[in-house]
Amino acid sequence: MNHGKISIRYAKALLGSATESKVEDKVYTDMCTLEQSFKQFATLQQVLTNPSITASEKANVLKLACGKNIHATTQAFIDFVIKQGRVSQMQWMALMYQELYRKKQNTVVTTLTSAIELPAALQKKIASWIEKNQGHKVELRTEINPDIIGGYIIDIENNRLDA
């Protein structure tokens, strides 16, 4: 069984449990925070796969990586994953959960890149325009790239609009 199948199965189970408890939004926030922790701290994956670190220490590290307000469903999921010996797949499970959640919510991740911080009103207007034209809810992420001479770049999944 490959990493993708395992991650998807666990992510589906987590989404099902979270949906049943009506906390899928909170778990989504936890999974996004966890994913950011994996990106920010390259050694996190090494810690999770290190055999000299105990299961309870790994659980504590993952719970800290999910942020201060980690939901009980996420905590239980982390404990379950560690008990099943699948902790090395946690990053992929977090990514798959996000993907499944967005699909369920009919949401697309859109990245808005500009040379300077754009006013919130303009960001909202751009997000509304995308929602209207794409037929999806938009999760807008912003990036600042001073190398852009003017205008902005909008990345909607696999499409790019350079304006």
Outline where the language-model segments fall.
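Elongated, mostly alpha-helical coiled-coil "stalk/stator" tethers of large membrane protein machines
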Residues: 1-163
